[in-house]
Every structure is written in C-alpha cells, then in structure tokens.
Amino acid sequence: MAAAVQVRLHQASFSERALDAYRTHCAMCRLKHRELLDAAHIIPDSDPDGHPEVSNGLSLCKIHHAAFDRAIIGIRPDYVIEVREDVLREEDGPMLKYGLQALHNSELFLPSRTADRPSKDALERRYQSFLR
C-alpha cells in the first residue's frame, strides 16, 4: 500500500517535469496539445528501476503512449522509432498509415537539455522487451 501511495505522489511532479522537458510536444509526432499528452515511463514505475526521473520518461500523445506501452512501437537506444513488423504490414485507415506506420525509422523529438534526454540504458532495456 505504501508503495502505491508513493507512486501516486510523484506522478504529478514527474508528469509536469517530463512534459516541460519536451516543450509540451509528443516525442513521436510533435503534437502540441498538452491536454492530449501523457508522461510515459520508459521503465515502468512498477519496476524497482522505474524511477520518476525525466530521463526515464517521454512526453507522448495518448495514442503513442498506448502504442509504446503495448509494444506496438519501440524506441532504439539511438533514439530511432520502430513500428512492429506485423503493424507495418497491416492495411487500414489514415490513422494507422500516418499515425503509426509513418513513424517507422523516424527520430524521436528530444529535450534540449542533455540531462533530460531518455536514458540510453533504459531505452535499451525497453527495446529488448519490444523485440520479444
């Protein structure tokens, strides 16, 4: 119970700092509507290594946050976005084509401050789970 309370207490601060670091843009599609953005953890906060630090976070719009959490989209440690192979082969409407498939091999939008950029170690760990 104490861990759950601690997680909730840091969420607002983590979210604010992450969104500010990315200048209120989605790191994948550059959407700038704050009300449609989330602070996503690279290493989940339920993991002992999932610290509430900006370097363990990304500012993502709601669709890209969901796609990242469900391993539809992965991010390599060199900040390149990959879309899962089966999703790349799908045919559907414009949201799939332009909202997901078009991101494949594009570069992540990064914070200006080097210290706020995603941890390459955290990205590597998360990317390995994306590949499975």
Briefly describe each language-model feature range.
Residues H25, D38, L60:
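The −1 position to Zn-ligating cysteines in a subset of zinc-ribbon hairpins
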